[in-house]
């Protein structure tokens, strides 16, 4: 779809830094380990180092450390790191087409799947034949059917006349007169009714030779064609120069075009655009739209649409409306195509016009009886309505707009300009229509342009939440970086720059021109993911206070943090990249874009953050430290909790220097700590909380320099892990095993989706409209002439009996059931009130439409709130639509002291169980109107429970209950104003005498999936297509050159009958084997006996058959037969897949029964719905394959990173527990496994492994500096290393988890459903991951981790060899399975 939205994320790629990354990775493995320096004390992280004046030592790492700590070099790195991405993005925006937002369903189609290729082949064949393709194809060119008739005539002449000359054989190419009248009943009736029209049509049907038609198949030389009911139906002859634009015009055209539709003087005569309206009944249990209150509301809404500013400049103005005089005030604009044309007719000059412009509601039942005599009526209502059940839960309407617009010569004259004008106009309806829903009627609005506008607006509004997410994360980063503005700025900036790099790669390098709607998730997720790496770098740098030399400290930070973030970014990027193998373009693009962003984010942080940390430590750290120190001295108190001694350790310079030269650098892992502790006895598995500081170290006097919040968080984590990894580690492992078993049980119960996927929030206008499209009758048919304006002629008001022959031709329907006519008063009535007052008893009031006063009733005198009488309407009139019922009862009255009857008013039906019977009813207003007065009514809560009407509440205090059905107020016309003159259409019943005739039979209106059986087409050729995205060259059709229609005509007719007879697959009357027009079946039965009595489809008048043939160069090239399937389009893809298999197996059985050499054996069945179901089926399958692939990548990466099986095992167990628990929570939440859930699961493994890997990295670093007194006991070593690992990385991973959750929380409030669900899954997974890392992973490390293992180059090579060996064994196993015939599923939905 076209769009003008700017891209939300813009990234570029630093190609020059790839070599640096590779060099960094190689040096990771090749560097050597330094030895500890005796007597070296810890260095305060806030110390201001002097500038490095000496040149760097030889070696890559020394040069790198010097560059990042030299202010000039660090500043240059920051400048280049910011300027290069911005320069690349500027180059992209200036010299490449702008990125668009792809909101089309095409982005989710699997173009290489068999179902898609089949349907695309048919679509391309239809486009090449007719110029457009769509379910509505109202302007399907009749020249094809005429040409087919001519070919059949030639075949018949060759069969019966033998050798005739070529000139004689070409003579029948002028359509025979028999084809004009035809044997069909419609043709005879039309000819009888409109002889003039037939003569006119006969003159226009003379056509040029067949060669001319074949040369330009998209042109129709006829000026008009006669429709089945005698109306003229002009074709649309496009000009060759504007064929592309004209094809769009033809797609929206109907058979009700007019002879001068393309003459420049006839502005807006072509119905080209539309707004779809659906009115849903709500607010009561009955849900019937045909009530007076709801119909009046709908009529008011349609009038507001016509009164909207600018409507007359864009409305549809067909020539038919010129005969409707009341439409003159609207410049003869066509009213909405709606049943309101029957319910609100107008009267002018003694004639009734069914145009919906009247002010008064006609008789509802009589109007429905009149409308139901037309098959077109069923287009407006749901499938439950019938002659015996005049109720519908919804009502459809169409607002039509015409082209060409004023000041344009034709539709093709500056078409894009006309389209832009209409789009800017039509979106002004959104604000108005969004406010029209009431408590009784819900208004849904749609149409192509409005739908696109709604989707774009929804997407943009959801993207605004990303700015809220980024702002919250920026504030949190500021806090967690000890309120360092400098580090916070460059931390967030590095993420933004990575987005520019990734966007540059995505758009320029990979050549993708569109951002899919799923890519919007990146705006939320990447900030949370990218901040993880930022925290690791900052935390690692601050932890390395034991390194005095700033260069060594920077080298340690780059190596340690770079390695840890590399593996975590690798696993996360691999999890997203697993979706690249999906054949669904939207999922493929989402996986590619996210993997690029994660990779570029790691690279940007690797380059930017060391330089920022170098400048910060030289110049900004002392300033921030002094500010925070003064603030904390005044505002904070010291904590009473103990903390590991070296956290607060400040160096005390003894002898003037804490260090004697640089520490020898020997390996890539710098010791984390230089702490010597005295031996402490451990009892019951406890580890001493207080550690003895080495000599020369004392607790710092000010904790504010480290940030009070971070100190408290680190202290809390220390106590937490002391409990989980030492004291209660076996309890945690037991709970973990129990939860894992239960999770496996519940996760196995998660079922595939049972309904179509939600794209938007369920209560939104867009989603409700999409849901209804699965259930609506003829959701793809534009019935622009189904209203009473076109179906009914103006007729005299004095004669309500319809005598039109057009109505009598509707036979075979069920006659209306005999019923007494309900005679409603056509004028306002008066309700008279009288009363009986007995001593000692309350007054009882009588309500009557009769002014007489039988004894003992007495007239009510005005005053004291009494109301002698009031005016009412006996039928809905204007805003007087609230119905009140007067109920009468004799129960509970004493005959001696009271009258024999009592009355009450209610808004509901009379309660027969309590003795109340219906007396009469009337209509009032619920809001104050002009010239009205307000009255109150109530029912006594004491015997005899009678009712009363009065002027004010003090006189109606019969009940203290709140307003309800028997108590409240209403407005009635004021008696001082002259009575309004009711129009002649008020309560008008067109069927008041003998009725309107039989109701029409419900036609076939496309409620199921339309399946096409195609012959003569082999497939589609896309070899020349560059498949970067769904938008591009669709390819070309590959035809079957050996296909001969007349040779296979008998088999085709047999297949048509066989498929139509299968009631399990095809609906009754759903077979459309032939194209529309001119009784082709009467010719076919002469060619072969099998072609006699072909099934006839039951279509709407004007609805064209979906069957089609392709004619080229004087021969039939292909044919497609259409069948309305019993498949319900609202089912889930997994349920519908069984219907697809039934169709496929049945057709193959029929084709295999054909003769061996028949070309029909290459036929196939296809359906647009099959494309849709395979989107989700293959999407889920590819996502699950991606889950397995990402799991394998993560296992391999973690194995190489940890280099020990006992370190790999805790990580794998944690990942398994995390994924199973998340899936279990999804099951408990009532979710099902759809495409969104499967895609989310595929990235869970990569995001779950991050925190565990960081913890294992801390465990390995702690082993590099194991205290001597801990080296004796293996259990003590494991526990100490686990505690040190949490102390090292705990704050970083908790901060990362917190930012990730905050980044995804705004996704919860998105209207786009995949966004919201994706955000919930990511937030849930992040929460479970950090919880399992701090509990299960620490407990498992404290139990099974190797106590004295340290990572070496040898262990790395062994782990790498084991991974390669395992990969080779897995590949060999796959080959063995393939040789044995086992099929291995692939992400593309196929199998090996």
UniProtKB/Swiss-Prot annotation:
GO terms for cellular component: cytoplasm; cytoplasmic vesicle membrane; endoplasmic reticulum; endoplasmic reticulum membrane; membrane; nuclear membrane. Induction: Up-regulated by thyroid hormone T3. Residues 457-615 form the SSD domain. One of its GO terms (biological process) is negative regulation of neuron differentiation. The chain crosses the membrane at residues 74-94, 463-483, 485-505, 509-529, 574-594, 596-616, 730-750, 1183-1203, 1205-1225, 1292-1312, 1321-1341, 1359-1379. Residues 16-40, 162-248 are annotated as: Disordered. Residues 1-73, 484, 530-573, 617-729, 1204, 1313-1320, 1380-1392 are cytoplasmic. Pfam families: DUF7023 (PF22894), MMPL (PF03176), Sterol-sensing (PF12349). Plays a role in neuronal proliferation and differentiation. Plays a role in the accumulation of cellular cholesterol. Involved in intracellular lipid droplet formation. May contribute to cholesterol homeostasis in neuronal cells. This is Protein dispatched homolog 3. It comes from Homo sapiens.
